[in-house]
């Protein structure tokens, strides 16, 4: 059956669900899981069903040697389980031989597998909400190297996971590794535009005043979507790399070359999946500023800022960047949330739609492509 993206409390329970819906949060994903849970509880109460929470308490305690185990603290027999994991949350720590050790994506993925094992054979069905796809940046083989994301997906399929829900995958074609498993890649385009207009209500999307620029060839699809729904023009950069050297695990970028029309006097919107160190984004923004761009808005679904915020503070102070738009789909350092130039987008309601749809075996097509909502958002401004 199909479902409108605007879920009413009545439609929430008017169809029989697959099984009782329950949420499990891996360590480090408590914030997003809690926000998803609030939407589900609110919808349930509006439909006359009293439910304090859908979250099952769990833990992944560590032994002093660093070994761990997954522990689920309530019965899950016959339940439709949704496990939320944030592989990018480096702020979670554990003791290892009396040293404070920060969790890596590998540690988070191991915890996910532990919790899947803890419910295996008892839950009716297990789905995984992994906003930032584990190993997603290692999605293809160029030389003799591992294919981490593909192997991880196959491992989850072998463990009995039925559905994977991710957001803005670095390359969604990685789902080819598990063609028989349900894999949904959602783009928070509507949520970003809504927050953008809340931040700047007077922002004009007229093609004479606004343009979209892709920071590289890999980000073209997401930027093409923005330019198509906004009705503005699209430019792009491509990276010239030195393939004779490897620095920090990648071939260093020699230069960014721009392809597109003039950006002079325009507001430029740059969308990418990740801001890691941010060097590429800042170099692209500086290049566009030199070409006469009036304002530059950077958007990244996963604002990691692995090298800190100082360079971005300076870029904003120097007038190179106007602001940066990110989401709460991964951990954000507390300092980032205090910056005036940062816009934090809440995507938890969008994720809650997926939980509801899958729990009722409803179509998620209208959720994945929110074109109607974007059209209404833009129409209401006129």
Regions found by a protein language model. Give the residues of each.
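PRPP-associated nucleotide enzymes
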Residues: 1-382
């Amino acid at each position: 059956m199909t479902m409108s993206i605007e879920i009413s409390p009545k439609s929430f329970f008017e169809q029989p669900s697959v099984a009782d819906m329950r949420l499990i949060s891996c360590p480090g994903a408590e914030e997003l899981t809690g926000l998803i849970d609030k939407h589900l509880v609110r919808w349930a109460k509006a439909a006359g069903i009293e439910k304090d929470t859908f979250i099952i308490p769990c833990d992944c305690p560590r032994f002093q040697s660093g070994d761990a185990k997954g522990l689920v603290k309530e019965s899950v027999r016959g339940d439709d389980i949704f496990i939320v994991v944030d592989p990018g949350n480096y702020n979670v720590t554990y003791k290892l031989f009396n040293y404070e050790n920060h969790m890596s994506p590998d540690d988070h993925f191991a915890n996910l597998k532990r919790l899947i094992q803890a419910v295996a054979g008892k839950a009716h069905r297990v789905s995984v909400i992994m906003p930032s796809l584990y190993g997603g940046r290692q999605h293809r083989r160029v030389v003799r190297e591992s294919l981490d994301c593909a192997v991880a997906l196959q491992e989850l399929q072998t463990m009995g996971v039925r559905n994977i829900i991710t957001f803005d995958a670095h390359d969604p074609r990685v789902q080819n590794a598990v063609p028989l498993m349900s894999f949904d890649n959602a783009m928070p385009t509507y949520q970003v535009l809504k927050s953008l207009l809340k931040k700047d209500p007077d922002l004009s999307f007229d093609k004479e005043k606004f343009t979209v620029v892709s920071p590289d060839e890999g980000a073209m699809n997401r930027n093409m979507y923005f330019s198509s729904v906004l009705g503005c023009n699209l430019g792009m950069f491509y990276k010239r790399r030195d393939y004779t050297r490897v620095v920090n695990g990648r071939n260093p970028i020699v230069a960014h070359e721009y392809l597109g029309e003039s950006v002079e006097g325009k507001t430029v919107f740059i969308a990418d999946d990740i801001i890691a160190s941010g060097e590429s984004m800042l170099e692209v923004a500086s290049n566009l500023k030199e070409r006469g761009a009036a304002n530059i808005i950077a958007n990244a679904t996963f604002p990691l800022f692995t090298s800190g915020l100082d360079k971005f503070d300076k870029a904003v102070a120097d007038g190179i960047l106007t602001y940066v738009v990110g989401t709460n789909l991964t951990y954000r350092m507390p300092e980032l949330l205090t910056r005036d130039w940062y816009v934090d987008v809440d995507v938890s309601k969008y994720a809650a739609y997926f939980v509801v749809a899958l729990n009722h075996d409803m179509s998620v097509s209208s959720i994945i492509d929110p074109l109607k909502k974007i059209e209404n958002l833009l129409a209401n401004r006129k």
